[in-house]
């Protein structure tokens, strides 16, 4: 599990590497499009989730890859099979979808995030890239997503978590690459770096540390 941590906007986009190599299953690889990466089992769950709020859970789960039934040239969407799979997969991560036909817009933010992740895993993702998966979530919803990320990793899935929230990344990560204003400050194993050190290396980290010291001093000062 790798965690990319940095301040807001420092890791907003990705490009072809200026140097180095991308190795997938022991082979040097060059991706010409996102589809190339997807074909090799590398899936990305973007910050906007790519879900349609007015469409059902099932429709979002299978979007563009619907199971079909019927004779050749007259195939139709197998809604019964799709509903069953969608409900089962969501149930496996602890989310009870009583009606798979319900609109995704009725789900909580954490449930929608888990739906997007579960969809990627179901369709064969071996490497999962998550872009700010907890940025718009409350404490409880974020914990649901983080627990699912840990569960996915424990089942052999490689997870790359992109976030500016060290407090979410540190408990679930094994190694961390720190980015500051678009530049890498290095990759560290968890045993070699503390949460506080990670935070201080990020853009704005030193300012936050200074603020904490100032606030402590203010609290110690006698009231006027």
Predicted regions span which residues?
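Glycine-rich phosphate-binding loops of nucleotide-dependent enzymes
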Residues: 7-224
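Single conserved hydrophobic/aromatic residue that forms the stacking wall/gate
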Residues: 1-6
């Amino acid at each position: 599990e790798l965690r990319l941590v940095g301040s807001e906007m420092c890791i907003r986009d990705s490009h072809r590497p200026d140097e180095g190599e991308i190795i997938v299953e022991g082979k040097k690889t060059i991706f010409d499009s996102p589809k190339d990466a997807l074909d090799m089992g590398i899936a990305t769950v973007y910050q906007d989730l790519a879900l349609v709020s007015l469409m059902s859970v099932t429709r979002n789960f299978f979007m563009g890859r619907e199971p079909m039934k019927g004779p050749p040239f007259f195939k139709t969407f197998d809604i019964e099979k799709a509903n069953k799979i969608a409900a089962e997969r969501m149930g496996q991560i602890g989310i009870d979808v009583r009606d798979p036909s319900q609109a995704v817009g009725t789900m909580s933010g954490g449930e929608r995030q888990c739906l997007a992740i579960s969809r990627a895993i179901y369709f064969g993702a071996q490497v999962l890239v998550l872009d700010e998966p907890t940025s718009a979530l409350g404490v409880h919803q974020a914990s649901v997503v983080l627990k699912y990320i840990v569960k996915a990793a424990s089942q052999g899935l490689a997870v790359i978590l992109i976030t500016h929230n060290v407090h979410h990344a540190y408990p679930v990560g094994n190694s961390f690459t720190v980015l500051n204003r678009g530049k890498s400050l290095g990759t560290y194993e968890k045993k070699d770096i503390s949460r506080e050190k990670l935070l201080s290396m990020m853009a704005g980290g030193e300012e936050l540390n200074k603020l904490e010291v100032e606030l402590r001093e203010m609290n110690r000062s006698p009231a006027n």
